[in-house]
Amino acid sequence: MKQTITALVGLLLASVMLSSCDDKRSFADMLSDENKSVNLYLSDHRVVGSIPPDSAFEVGPDAPYYQLDEDGNIYMQVLSKGDMKLRPVKDDRVYFRFLRYNLNRYQTGEDLVGVGNSNDIVGSNGLGTTYFLYDNYKLQTSYKYGTGLQMPMHFLGANAHVMLIVKSQSGWPDEMANVIPFLYDVTYYSSPLSPWKAEVDADNK
């Protein structure tokens, strides 16, 4: 899985760098600004540079931001772990509602305005139409949201609620050339039409 993600990101970055050659600001300059924006935001919060053993994340609005990847492109603050006995497996539908905020505005002191689908209730399942297939990075309908939004589901359960920082390299591929880091307020759901299978405790088997 990691090799597939790395290859896809590499191809996307190559195309982004080529498309940025004619811009007044270089791709490197834009990446530098992105890092400054993220670092400024994180400087106002606690940061843990690794994933805790057994996913023992601190929870709540004062919890730290945990670095989820080796490159420092994804950071997560856990507001709710959700149902840890109800977790997705490969190709399960994961519905999500979110608001996202442009963190470059944080650096310039502008108001952060959230944009997203948090009020989307279209669809027979009542969860809206926005979903990805868990751990599937091949189908465009799933990969179009990037790798960052899937990361919390490696560690959390249904109805998990997190604040998630996603740099452009792990964000939506069609927006990668913009080099904008986003802060997501996102909640994940299992579909009632095809629910994830609950895990059984070893002591209760």
Question: In which residue ranges do the predicted regions lie?
Answer:
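Bacterial N-terminal signal peptides that target proteins for export
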Residues: M1-V9
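Cross-family detector of peptidyl-prolyl cis-trans isomerase
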Residues: I5, C21-K205
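C-terminal motif of bacterial Sec signal peptides marking the signal peptidase cleavage site
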Residues: V16-S20
